């Protein structure tokens, strides 16, 4: 999920601003979602996701990708030969784009934090990348994920860092001359660990990735080095690995 980083950028480009819910936002974004060559968040999140994925067994297992979007991580997942891969997203247009890339993909349209099309204890691995903060209730979402996860299974989460939200960063994209801001809900990392523990999960790994020299060229291309200097060192994304004993 692309996030332009700073509130002022829309004003600088003369764009109006509109705040929308996740379904409307990603439906509107779907047609251009895959064209994000200079996205700072994705530049930091993608290698972190690969690090998380290397910690779990994919081959022969059932994987559920919650907030799958257009299937950004699917080439990496499918290269490790899962027994099945299910894409879940609340946006019908995003799922249409996923189907365009993977015509045989099994998909399910999420209903808020509910996954009615997925049976109890039917998955070995749940992946959620840059999606959880779009759900108003993290506790109910993680509880539902635990419902569909088998014992011995794992959950991998990446998301926009709550500290970045507190620093004024937003999840936005540009469409029709407007800056579209997609609603999101920050959950502190300690609170997220507590929720997971209450749901019967065990945290085994966590990491953060901050704005650093590796993404400086992206700020340079956007002619936004002042923002880079201001926010250098700010954690922008985090990743967590939980297991269900």
Task: Place the predicted regions along the sequence by residue.
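Conserved class I S-adenosyl-L-methionine
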Residues: 2-57, 72-76, 94-97, 156-179, 183, 210, ...
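Class I SAM-dependent methyltransferase SAM/SAH-binding core
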Residues: 64-66, 70-114
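A short acidic, Gly/Pro-enriched loop at the edge of an enzyme's catalytic core
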Residues: 116-126
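A short SAM/SAH-binding and catalytic strip from SAM-dependent methyltransferases
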Residues: 125-138
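A short glycine-rich, Lys/Arg-flanked "PGG" loop and its adjoining helix->strand segment in the class I
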Residues: 139-151
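Short alpha-helix
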Residues: 184-206
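A C-terminal cap/extension of S-adenosyl-L-methionine-dependent methyltransferases
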Residues: 203-245
């Amino acid at each position: 999920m692309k996030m332009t980083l700073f509130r002022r950028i829309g004003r600088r480009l003369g764009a109006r601003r509109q705040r929308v819910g996740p379904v409307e936002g990603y439906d509107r974004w779907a047609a251009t979602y895959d064209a994000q060559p200079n996205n700072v968040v994705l530049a930091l999140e993608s290698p972190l996701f690969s690090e998380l994925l290397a910690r779990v067994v994919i081959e022969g297992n059932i994987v559920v990708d919650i907030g799958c979007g257009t299937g950004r991580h699917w080439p990496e997942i499918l290269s490790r030969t899962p027994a099945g891969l299910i894409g879940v997203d609340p946006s019908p247009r995003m799922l249409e784009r996923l189907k365009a890339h993977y015509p045989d993909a099994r998909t399910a349209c999420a209903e808020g934090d509910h996954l009615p099309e997925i049976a109890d204890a039917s998955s070995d691995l749940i992946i959620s990348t840059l999606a959880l903060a779009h759900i108003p209730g993290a506790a109910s979402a993680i509880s539902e994920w635990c419902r569909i996860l088998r014992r011995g299974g794992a959950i991998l989460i990446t998301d926009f860092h709550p500290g970045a939200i507190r620093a004024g960063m937003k999840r936005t994209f540009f469409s029709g001359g407007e800056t579209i801001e997609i609603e999101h809900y920050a959950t502190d990392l300690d609170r997220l660990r507590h929720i997971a523990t209450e749901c019967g999960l065990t945290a085994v790994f966590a990491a953060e990735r901050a704005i650093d020299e590796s993404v400086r060229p992206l700020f340079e291309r956007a002619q936004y080095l002042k923002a880079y200097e201001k926010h250098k060192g700010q954690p922008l994304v985090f990743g967590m690995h939980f297991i269900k004993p």
